[in-house]
Amino acid sequence: MGKNVVVLGTQWGDEGKGKIVDLLTEHATAVVRYQGGHNAGHTLVIDGEKTVLHLIPSGVLREGVQCLIGNGVVVAPDALLREIIKLEEKGIPVRERLRISPSCPLILSYHVALDQAREKARGEFKIGTTGRGIGPAYEDKVARRGLRIGDLFHRERFAAKLGELLDYHNFVLVNYYKEPAIDFQKTLDECMEYADLLKPLMLDVTAALHEMRRDGKDIMFEGAQGSLLDIDHGTYPYVTSSNTTAGGIATGSGFGPMYLDYILGITKAYTTRVGSGPFPTELFDDVGAFLAKRGHEFGATTGRARRCGWFDAVILRRAIEINSISGLCLTKLDVLDGLETINICVGYENEEGAVIDAPTDADSYLGLRPVYEQMPGWSESTLGAKTLEELPAAARAYIKRVEELVGAPIDIISTGPDRNETIVLRHPFG
């Protein structure tokens, strides 16, 4: 009987999901993306060679693994095709193994224009989006006016819908944001080119997943971004536009929650965030700079510097509950090597002096102060360790304390960027 495993982020994204998905796909028949778009950036390092993926599931680098994009993913055809070509130049037969749901909403040029115009208009109050049209595409979906990949294969119907959409969005772009209009004919011609290239990749992903389930195959679901960026459960409004939590699997792929066997939560040994929004443990001192430099904390998608801070057990406890986490993978432990002391946030103190749990919206974080528990650091290197016994005693104590504070076992520890630099204590597919 097969196992169905989920890998998702438990913080604000950039936790190191790509490496772990790649590691675990050795046991998987298929890897599935179920939400987000090309705002994700999953970095894989195999034998020292770095590959960054945005839309295509991380299983693409494992020979024979099928890669599926479910209906919950918003797809920018130009970005997808660029990614396919780049991988094919490395000798990876992407088109043989990649299949996409025709129900995926399309991201087109007017979505990008709207996204960037809004961020520009917000000025210092911008959300911090990637400017890639993700939010506007999801808005069109929810408003029931969006175009899907399947619409591309019906030219007349597609052209009529596109005309209506451009009338609507161009009115806003030109009259409200004072930006240039998007050209109808140019957009239509581009889309018809996409149609010819994408048609061979179409598949009823939901039906395929259930066929695999009945056949006893092992399936992995790959989350993008992190739980604290979830549109419903994140630090609203500084969130993404999709459900990044485990609930997004059912809606984004058609695979019901009762079929899931194990949910692996990826969490850094410290905390990072890209863009705007609350971040209680953020550091503005030498330690923050140390973490950023040692951890190479720059976004794989945008190149933006990530904000860095101490590990936050409060937000992780919330993420564990929301996602029904079975076990954790602690990544970038080696980045903490050399610190004399390490702080863990165990609570938030409000202006009245009361210690409270994680708020559910951004404004409620105002005035909160992190309550820290201090632990000894270690001077020895943890880089590349493959067993728990190889780690310094202080590092093992840190891991144990994190488990105690968050109420979940740490089943995997990542000690470096390469897939081999990993300690596996309990295998999700085991």
Swiss-Prot record:
Protein residues bound to substrate: A300, T301, T302, G303, R304, A305, R306
Keyword flag rRNA processing: no
Predominant subcellular localization, coarse grouping: cytoplasm
GO molecular function: adenylosuccinate synthase activity; GTP binding; magnesium ion binding
Cellular compartments annotated: Cytoplasm
Top-level EC class as recorded in UniProt: ligase
E.C. designation(s): 6.3.4.4
Catalytic activity: IMP + L-aspartate + GTP = N(6)-(1,2-dicarboxyethyl)-AMP + GDP + phosphate + 2 H(+)
Keywords: Cytoplasm, GTP-binding, Ligase, Magnesium, Metal-binding, Nucleotide-binding, Purine biosynthesis
Pathway: Purine metabolism; AMP biosynthesis via de novo pathway; AMP from IMP: step 1/2
Positions annotated to bind GTP: 13-19, 41-43, 306, 332-334, 414-416
Active-site residues, record numbering mapped to chain: D14 (proton acceptor), H42 (proton donor)
PANTHER family tied to this protein: ADENYLOSUCCINATE SYNTHETASE
UniProt subunit comment: Homodimer.
Protein name, per record: Adenylosuccinate synthetase
Organism in which the protein naturally occurs: Pseudomonas savastanoi pv. phaseolicola (strain 1448A / Race 6)
